[in-house]
Amino acid sequence: MKKKTLGLCALAMLSLAHNTRANEMTAVRDNTTVTNHALKAAAYKSNRPALKNRLFTSKAVEAEIARIKQLLTNPKLAWMFENCFPNTLDTTVHFRMLNGKPDTFVYTGDIHAMWLRDSGAQVWPYVQLAHKDPELKEMLEGVIRRQFLCINIDPYANAYNDGPVGGNWMSDKTDMKPELHERKWEIDSLCYPLRLAYQYWKETGDASIFDNEWLKAIANILQTFKEQQRKDGTGPYSFQRKTERALDTLNNDGLGAPVNPVGLIVSSFRPSDDATTFQFLIPSNFFAVSSLHKAAEILTAVNHRPDLADECTALANEVEAALKKYAVYNHPEFGPIYAFEVDGFGNHMLMDDANVPSLLAMPYLGDVDINDPIYQNTRRFVWSTSNPYFFRGTAGEGIGGPHIGYDMIWPMSIMMKAFTSQDDEEIKWCIKTLMDTDAGTGFMHESFHKDNPAKFTRPWFAWQNTLFGELILKLVNEGKVELLNSL
């Protein structure tokens, strides 16, 4: 994707990232005394933008940063947490009012557009703090309202502009509108807003977001999911782009590979924004099931719309039954595993991609039980050389994907390994690897080379930064401070 001109926060992020290598060199020496520990901690200076340049500040988030930093004795880990956890708020959140209601537009980072997936994931770890901070709660309400608004502009789009300003992809051969940044159909784009709205409601008790705009969004989600089951033909969506990247366009005149209409939902593109090979993307279909059940609960409890709730539940049950029948492949080494993609004709794509939803991340999203034996087999498969996009080198190991290509590991995959781990030593390895592959910047990156972390993509990628903060916060709250302090 082409990147727009960097703004003030972008320049601050890039400058800070490059200026911290001296800090890293000063602070990597092993400390053996309290004095050395204090000196080492002092060497790590915050890489956050100056207070006046931060786009949004939250008292609850700042208090949480202070609390976690006080508990962590590893100065580099504390420094990285301080840099990463608030990165979405510091650099990507644009809060305002629209027609008397909160409205929040969230950049993905160095690309000044709002992805439904990224924005829903970027603000996710702040939801647990919303009850402590009315301003944070209002900002989150604005994200949810903006997501519903985006869905109602076009439920097939993955990324949106802040207004009808057009953009790089207006020449794509699809039903583009100036409000759209990109129109790649991805199931998870409609799931992340449901996940976020549901959790916000559960944490705050605020049901005001479930108004007519919400009901319209639900109708659009249901219609889109059903159209993409393709029971009545290929449906209204197609996509073509003039490009050198094969996975940035769809074959068969923009319709993608054929599918057998067995009840699963087509996802023309993956969460990486790469085209699917077989269009029933399994992790995203699992995500649709859990998201539809959440929507049904809201529609029943808040809107008193049993008709829509029943429609959500029936669709979820249909997709779930089809997953049980078509998603499992009997691997000669790992036994029954979940395929990454299928087509309903018997073809299976055996791989995983780092972007979430992924096969590895399914328990993180609440889509499968972590002790599901098929998931555990799948987890072993994806973290092995049997997965064509698993890379191992001198700097680390992990999952990447065709979006960046050979030998490039996504930190997101290492984070998901930690999120889905039940082994403290494995978690410890994950955190240490993440700390060792930041290239001295104090931030996460989109991907890094398996043999050289200094070779990385995207110095400003808010989702991965905030996700790292979410992981550390989760581990602290689960009583694993001692594990973190052993690093």
Where in the sequence are the language-model features?
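Well-ordered alpha-helical scaffold segments within catalytic/enzyme domains
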Residues: 60-74, 121-134, 192-207, 286-305, ...
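Extended, well-ordered alpha-helical scaffold segments
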Residues: 80, 134-150, 207-226, 295, ...
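Bacterial Sec-dependent N-terminal signal peptides
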Residues: 1-24
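C-terminal capping/lid segments that line or modulate ligand- or cofactor-binding pockets
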Residues: 172-178, 183-186, 349-369, 407-487
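Acidic, low-complexity proline/glycine-rich segments
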Residues: 36-40, 44-53, 248-264, 486
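Low-complexity, Ser/Thr/Pro/Gly-enriched N-terminal "stalk/linker" regions
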Residues: 24-117
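Extended ligand-binding clefts on enzyme/binding-domain cores
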Residues: 116, 152-156, 160-163, 169-178, ...
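Aromatic-rich carbohydrate-recognition surfaces in CAZymes
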Residues: 112-140, 144-247, 461-476
